[in-house]
Amino acid sequence: MSQNTSVGIVTPQKIPFEMPLVLENGKTLPRFDLMIETYGELNAEKNNAVLICHALSGNHHVAGRHSAEDKYTGWWDNMVGPGKPIDTERFFVVGLNNLGGCDGSSGPLSINPETGREYGADFPMVTVKDWVKSQAALADYLGIEQWAAVVGGSLGGMQALQWAISYPERVRHALVIASAPKLSAQNIAFNDVARQAILTDPDFNEGHYRSHNTVPARGLRIARMMGHITYLAEDGLGKKFGRDLRSNGYQYGYSVEFEVESYLRYQGDKFVGRFDANTYLLMTKALDYFDPAADFGNSLTRAVQDVQAKFFVASFSTDWRFAPERSHELVKALIAAQKSVQYIEVKSAHGHDAFLMEDEAYMRAVTAYMNNVDKDCRL
């Protein structure tokens, strides 16, 4: 089947969980919702399910369109669908919006049952462990005892790794793409600067901006602009725009003059229109806190000692946000723990965002690995 085939029109589902969820910080959500989309069919043995975990600004809408009029497909439509690397003719694929998100799952935009008002800044801090715990509840709801694979890029890859550690018997394969076993100091610094842009916006109103009929648009816009720079290759913007001007000469002022300025402001404005600032704060802190080795004497090898999953790890040559060396740390730990791991470093000019793009070598590698996952489903 053609690589251009889509899953078509898809309908999200909001799954209610009328149960408490105790979070890593000791707080409890009395109940929670998870917004999901599914693609393909769960087989009779219920052993062909694949969980897709999203990155910082992702959500449940992985593939397809919500209507025929939709201009854009899901964020990983080139990866998930009939005849694609994660083939929905063979796998039952589940995408979800994580807790703390702003696309239907319980988060800052949800109603706090204790107050009858939106949580806003009162939504509790969540971690990758908390997400995986809620995803395990989702697996129970769907009747899935074991995922054929848990797949994610960037922050999604951290979730795939945490799944293999937290629930070793429930994951057969973990695909960790463009990720890291913990953030570097530089990455934490980037996240903090982004948060400060939001927190110091006069319209933030201590996180309760919606009750004041405001939005910290300036801060969120700057956070996204800065983040977008780091997701590209070192001189990705230079190759794309150079020093091209929007007009024939310098204007000698502070308005938008360079094409790169126009591009970044467009990206920032688009992001403000679809994302919540409190969610952005929560997601970046979840990134900062992720460090599974910390529970095992700061030994990543010990952290993966009990995993049962086989691993596929991929990095990209020009990704400096999650450099190949960070993937090497995980690969070396898995080898030291005598676990099964396949690794590929893809030559790409697209930086961190390469994991979202349709690179031939990358797609071929994921396809080959998922063929092995499919074979395991048939044993």
Swiss-Prot record:
The record ties this protein, via HAMAP family, to: MetX_acyltransf (MF_00296)
Instruction: Tell me one GO molecular function of this protein.
Output: homoserine O-acetyltransferase activity
Site feature location: Important for acyl-CoA specificity: R321
Q: Where does substrate bind?
A: R224, D353
Where is this protein localized, as stated in its record?
Cytoplasm
Write the gene name: metXS
User: What is this protein for, i.e. what is its function?
Assistant: Transfers a succinyl group from succinyl-CoA to L-homoserine, forming succinyl-L-homoserine.
Reactions that this protein is recorded to catalyse: L-homoserine + succinyl-CoA = O-succinyl-L-homoserine + CoA
Please report the name of this protein according to its UniProt entry: Homoserine O-succinyltransferase
**Cross-referenced Pfam families:** Abhydrolase_1 (PF00561)
Into which EC class is this enzyme placed?
Answer: transferase
Per UniProt, residues of the AB hydrolase-1 domain are: 48-357
Q: Which family would the database say this protein is a member of?
A: Belongs to the AB hydrolase superfamily. MetX family.
Chief subcellular location: cytoplasm
Presence of the UniProt keyword Acyltransferase in the record: yes
Q: Which GO terms describe its biological process?
A: homoserine metabolic process; methionine biosynthetic process
Q: In which pathway does it act?
A: Amino-acid biosynthesis; L-methionine biosynthesis via de novo pathway; O-succinyl-L-homoserine from L-homoserine: step 1/1
Q: Which UniProt keywords apply?
A: Acyltransferase, Amino-acid biosynthesis, Cytoplasm, Methionine biosynthesis, Transferase
Q: Does the keyword Cell inner membrane apply?
A: no
Q: How does it assemble?
A: Homodimer.
EC numbers, comma separated: 2.3.1.46
Q: Where is the active site?
A: S154, D319, H352
Q: Any one cellular component term from GO for this entry?
A: cytoplasm
Organism, by scientific name, is: Neisseria gonorrhoeae (strain ATCC 700825 / FA 1090)
